[in-house]
Curated annotation (Swiss-Prot):
Keyword flag Cytoplasm: no
Superkingdom per UniProt: Bacteria
Gene: folD
Keyword annotations: Amino-acid biosynthesis, Histidine biosynthesis, Hydrolase, Methionine biosynthesis, Multifunctional enzyme, NADP, One-carbon metabolism, Oxidoreductase, Purine biosynthesis
Biological classification of the source: Bacteria, Bacillati, Actinomycetota, Actinomycetes, Mycobacteriales
Keyword field contains Oxidoreductase: yes
GO cellular component entries: cytosol
Catalytic activity: (6R)-5,10-methylene-5,6,7,8-tetrahydrofolate + NADP(+) = (6R)-5,10-methenyltetrahydrofolate + NADPH; (6R)-5,10-methenyltetrahydrofolate + H2O = (6R)-10-formyltetrahydrofolate + H(+)
Enzyme Commission designation: 1.5.1.5, 3.5.4.9
Species for this entry: Nocardia farcinica (strain IFM 10152)
Full protein name: Bifunctional protein FolD
């Protein structure tokens, strides 16, 4: 079987073109959309990602300010910074970059982000709005998975989707988004017994657990679609996903590549959220 590569390049380009046009309209009105990137780590991979976000914002006409709190930042210090930026009308959007210091849990500080500026949908309020089916910003990676599947015309209504991973930033919100598309969703995790017995019955398998090569050809039925959300550092310094692509390719009908699949769409959606926040603030 020929496995179609579910790339995100075309979708990301279309999203970015629309975002750029809207950002330029805001700038023409006198005030550019502005994002605060809050960083509390010295992680090289995080630094690379933050730099890529800043470059993406610059290309699209979005002002982006990196605010470094240091790897020794406390929960109180992070919350104070988030509250200050939430109250500052100069900023339309806030993104708290992970990882956080070992002593700080995302759930303990994210509630300090104002919902109207929480463009990555990580606060308890944003996640609650999503669970209730109400308007709010959605975690961009979870949204990117759904948008990528739609872009490649993968049907979701009535289909069985197995989501491997239950984090608050991908797995859980993705399950909510898939339910809204009328999919039948099974969420698997580290305590799931016989993972392959579940995933091999699914029409779509989404791997979002952060373990390189966890999902293999044995986990996938012939003709299924596989979306790889993982970004793990390989021994050679490159990036690999949560899916063993070689064993899945030729068995799955479609497979998103790493890199080049979900990632570009996630960044594009984050930038679109920033502009949407700015548009709402401008009335």
């Amino acid at each position: 079987m020929d496995t179609v590569s579910l790339t995100g390049k075309e979708l990301a380009a279309a999203l970015n073109a629309d975002t750029k046009q809207r950002a330029e309209a805001l700038t023409a009105g006198g005030v550019a959309a502005r994002l605060a990137l809050i960083v509390a780590n010295d992680d090289p991979a995080s630094a690379w990602y933050v730099n890529s976000l800043r470059k993406a914002a610059e290309r699209l006409g979005i002002a982006c300010e990196r605010i470094d709190l240091g790897a020794d930042a406390t929960a109180d210090g992070i919350r104070a910074e988030l509250r200050e930026r939430s109250a500052d009308p100069a900023f339309d959007a806030i993104m708290l970059q992970t990882p956080l210091p070992a002593s700080v849990a995302l759930d303990d500080v994210s509630s300090a982000i104002a919902a109207d500026k929480d463009v990555d949908g990580v606060s308890p309020l944003s996640l609650g709005l999503l669970a209730a089916g109400l308007a709010g910003f959605v975690p961009a990676t979870a949204q990117a998975v759904v948008e990528l599947l739609k872009h490649h015309e993968i049907a979701l209504s009535g289909r069985h989707v197995a989501v491997v991973g239950r984090s608050n930033v991908v797995g859980k919100p993705l399950a909510q988004l898939l339910l809204a598309e009328n999919a039948t969703v099974t969420v698997c995790h580290s305590r799931t017994t016989d993972l392959a017995a579940i995933t091999s019955t699914a029409d779509v398998v989404v791997a979002a657990v952060g373990r390189a090569g966890l999902v293999t050809g044995d986990h996938v039925r012939a003709g299924a679609v596989v979306v790889d959300v993982g970004t793990n550092e390989a021994e050679d310094g490159g990036i690999v996903g949560d899916v063993d692509a070689e064993s899945v390719r030729g068995k799955a009908a479609g497979l998103s590549p790493v890199p080049g699949g979900v990632g570009p769409v996630t960044t594009a959606l984050l930038m679109r959220h920033v502009v949407e926040a700015a548009e709402r603030h401008r009335g």
